């Protein structure tokens, strides 16, 4: 969304009119609508205006260089925005129409979707493959001389330190954390995970959530939905989706079984 000539940026500028889109973007939007329903709206790509208002109005490199300077859009109270349910997908004609005033941010699903596609291309010859896209990981096959893949869980309280580890036999693993993309706005700490119910950065009490699922986009989406919704969102998980949450005291909770915890 930070590239003015990207397909997503062009779509955001076309709100209110039908726009032709590529097969890939159409598939991302279709899956996004399915996940929006499955998470009862906790995953909502239409929160871009709230992200900008919170100060995430440019890339993290620019934000860090800017420091505590005012964002392009001044901080303000959340304002009503169109519901994601109002977007229209014309699958046969490969076109999309968003209501006026809607802006999309697909960062909550696109990285996982792309990483899994990359892994499948790399493993087309049948070899085992692991792709790590900045914390979003997808595994195909089995590692050499091992049955499962070993995954380290970073401690969100101490960057670059490991809190625990677990194993998976394949599929996707994604982690969302309120400590990864942070900045200050008017002296107030902010992060990039917007609660669609309030329009503000989420405050569920969990610092990070790691999710294992058959597909990486699924893990990506539910990691964010759980981090935003907290324990109340756990019943929304499909049976084949497991998670591990870390709170402010470093305590672990979830259905994903760690094989070791570093004290």
At which residue positions do the language-model features occur?
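Mature catalytic core of soluble alpha/beta enzymes
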Residues: 1-263
């Amino acid at each position: 969304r930070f590239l003015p000539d990207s397909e997503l940026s062009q779509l955001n500028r076309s709100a209110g009119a039908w726009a032709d889109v590529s097969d890939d973007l159409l598939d991302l939007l279709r899956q996004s609508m399915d996940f929006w329903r499955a998470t009862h709206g906790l995953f909502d790509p239409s929160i871009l205006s709230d992200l900008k208002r919170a100060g995430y109005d440019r890339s993290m490199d620019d934000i860090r260089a800017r420091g505590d300077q005012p964002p392009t859009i001044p901080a303000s109270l959340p304002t009503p925005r169109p519901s994601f349910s109002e977007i229209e997908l014309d699958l046969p004609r490969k076109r999309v129409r968003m209501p006026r005033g809607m802006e999309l941010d697909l960062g909550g699903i696109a990285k996982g979707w792309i990483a899994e596609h990359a892994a499948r291309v790399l493993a087309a010859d049948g070899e085992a493959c692991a792709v790590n896209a900045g914390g979003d990981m997808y595994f195909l096959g089995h590692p050499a001389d091992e049955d499962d893949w070993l995954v380290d869980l970073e401690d969100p309280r101490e960057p670059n330190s490991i809190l625990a580890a677990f194993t998976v036999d394949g599929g996707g693993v994604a982690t969302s954390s309120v400590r990864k993309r942070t900045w200050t706005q008017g002296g107030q700490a902010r992060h990039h995970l917007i609660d669609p119910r309030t329009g503000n950065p989420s405050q569920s009490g969990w610092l990070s959530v790691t999710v294992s699922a058959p597909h990486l986009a699924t893990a990506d989406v539910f990691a964010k939905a759980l981090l935003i919704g907290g324990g109340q969102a756990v019943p929304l998980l499909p049976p084949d989706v497991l998670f591990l949450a870390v709170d402010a005291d470093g305590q672990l909770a979830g259905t994903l079984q760690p094989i070791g915890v570093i004290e």
